């Protein structure tokens, strides 16, 4: 028996060694290319330590940064003095042995180091593909699919609010809730399938089963709330689409230049200067906002054909936008005359019919001595005729920036309501589910609906719960989806 055990152990070890040698050790530059203060080269795989020893003579203790002299393995020339970090498997990002070299960020230093790794003489080593480090982290159980998708969003975040939302996903918030749902669904399915053999004609009406379907219904409501909440968070991921509209010479171009902190649009006292929609992405108190400056809305014989096209584009942008800013001058006569124009009035009414958030900016307060007196009747008119809340009517000066801080604060509050809608107290659905994840949730919800509709037929109900469980598994990658995995990992840059 001992001989058989020894033979089995030797065979297993030989197979394991062959398997390990089949896994390539990968390396890549993990920081952006180009000259910088520091550049990080990452090496991951079964031969990572051998590569490091070839370049530096030794490997430091795990998780202790140590200074090492990096030499070319062929020419024996010094390349750089670098900090070396060793992360022993499985306690690394990839779950494999990982060595990181923190080099000086010169182009030659990086290029020669990468060449030295390639010429180290270590077998089965190659440059990493985009996202391959993250792919290994997934397959080695170091991260689930939602955490890696969250990591993509963290890397791509351009504003603070995008970053905060992405970090919830990257740190496992979506995984945690999916784990809870999937665990409960597996329990429900087990109960239903176990009941098939003991129920008469597969019909159930006992108290325990009734309670199960009540819980299924509650779970479906929770999932539906998260689907809707995810749609709102998608606005944050892509940027909030805001159209700036109003009459000519109201200060729309001045506003977009002010918010962008650079000259985007031409500012001129001549009417009709802006002909086409001009877009710019800006950061407003952490929210990514895609601003569109549009042609002034007006009618008249002096409106040229090309300006008419610009006005049609402006109205189309109002239709597409998620929030509309209407800009008017402080002069009440000019304000009332502007509202008499059907182009402006109908656009306001369309936004109200669509229940789209609107903010009114009464601009050029620096041009009058007592703007509060002139602002009062304009605000009263908007409140009375369009039921616009007081906190969405603002007196500002794009020239002196008066009133700008209060306006941006009010605008941020509206953005907050758009991306974090109020929900039932029992359901806090404010996670950033992306489109792929929401599709999985929608499919799960559909299967739960069918299970609830067929609650009298235990066989059908059990099958639908099984399919719903698989849909939740697809969110985190617990269910195999090779084609989806490759798409997600390809979104990472080389070195991540």
UniProtKB/Swiss-Prot annotation:
PANTHER family found in the cross-reference section: TRNA MODIFICATION GTPASE GTPBP3, TRNA MODIFICATION GTPASE GTPBP3, MITOCHONDRIAL
Example of a GO biological process term: mitochondrial tRNA wobble uridine modification
Gene name linked to the record: mss1
Gene3D superfamilies in alphabetical order: P-loop containing nucleotide triphosphate hydrolases, Probable tRNA modification gtpase trme, domain 1, tRNA modification GTPase MnmE domain 2
Biological source species: Schizosaccharomyces pombe (strain 972 / ATCC 24843) (Fission yeast)
Family from the record: Belongs to the TRAFAC class TrmE-Era-EngA-EngB-Septin-like GTPase superfamily. TrmE GTPase family.
GO CC terms of this entry: cytoplasm; mitochondrial inner membrane; mitochondrion
Pfam family, any one: MnmE_helical
MF (Gene Ontology): GTP binding; GTPase activity
Chief place of localization: mitochondrion
Subcellular location: Mitochondrion
Transit peptide segment: 1-19
Name of protein: tRNA modification GTPase mss1, mitochondrial
């Amino acid at each position: 028996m001992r001989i058989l055990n020894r033979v089995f152990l030797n065979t297993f070890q030989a197979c394991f060694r062959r398997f390990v040698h089949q896994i390539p050790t990968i390396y890549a530059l993990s920081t952006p290319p180009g000259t910088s203060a520091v550049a990080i080269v990452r090496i991951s795989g079964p031969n990572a330590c051998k590569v490091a020893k070839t370049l530096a003579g030794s490997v430091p203790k795990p998780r202790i940064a140590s200074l090492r002299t990096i030499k070319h393995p062929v020419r024996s020339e010094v390349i750089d003095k670098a900090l070396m970090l060793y992360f022993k498997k499985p306690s690394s990002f990839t779950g494999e042995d990982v060595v990181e070299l923190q080099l000086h960020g010169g182009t030659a230093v990086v290029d020669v180091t990468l060449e030295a790794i390639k010429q180290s003489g270590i077998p089965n080593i190659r440059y990493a593909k985009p996202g391959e480090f993250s792919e290994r982290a997934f397959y080695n159980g170091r991260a689930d699919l939602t955490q890696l998708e969250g990591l993509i969003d963290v890397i791509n975040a351009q504003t603070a609010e995008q970053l905060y939302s992405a970090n919830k996903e990257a740190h496992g918030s979506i995984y945690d809730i999916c784990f809870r749902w999937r665990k409960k669904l597996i329990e429900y399915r087990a109960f239903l399938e176990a009941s098939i053999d003991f129920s008469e004609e597969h019909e159930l009406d006992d108290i325990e089963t009734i309670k199960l379907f009540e819980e299924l219904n509650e779970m479906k409501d929770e999932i539906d709330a998260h689907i809707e909440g995810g749609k709102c968070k998608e606005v944050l991921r892509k940027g909030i689409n805001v159209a700036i509209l109003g009459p000519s010479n109201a200060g729309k171009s001045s506003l977009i230049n002010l918010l962008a902190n650079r000259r985007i649009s031409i500012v001129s006292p001549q009417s009709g200067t802006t002909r086409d929609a001009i877009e710019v992405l800006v950061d407003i108190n952490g929210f990514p906002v895609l601003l569109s400056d549009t042609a002034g809305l007006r009618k008249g014989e002096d409106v040229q054909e090309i300006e008419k096209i610009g006005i049609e584009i402006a109205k189309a942008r109002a239709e597409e936008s998620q929030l509309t800013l209407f800009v008017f001058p402080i002069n009440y006569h000019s304000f009332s005359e502007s509202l008499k124009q059907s182009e402006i009035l109908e656009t306001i009414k369309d936004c109200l019919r669509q229940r789209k958030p609107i903010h009114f900016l009464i601009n050029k307060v620096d041009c009058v001595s007592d703007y509060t007196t002139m602002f009062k009747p304009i605000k009263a008119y908007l409140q009375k005729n369009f039921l616009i809340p007081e906190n969405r009517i603002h007196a500002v000066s794009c020239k002196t920036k008066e009133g700008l801080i209060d306006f941006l604060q009010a605008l941020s509050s509206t953005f907050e309501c758009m991306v974090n809608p109020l929900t039932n107290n029992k359901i806090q659905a404010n996670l950033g589910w992306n489109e792929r994840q929401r599709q999985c949730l929608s499919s799960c919800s559909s299967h739960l609906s069918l299970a609830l509709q067929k609650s009298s037929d235990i066989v059908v109900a059990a099958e639908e719960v099984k399919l719903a469980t698989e849909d939740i598994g697809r969110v985190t990658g617990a269910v195999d989806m090779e084609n989806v995995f490759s798409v997600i990992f390809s979104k990472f840059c080389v070195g991540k």
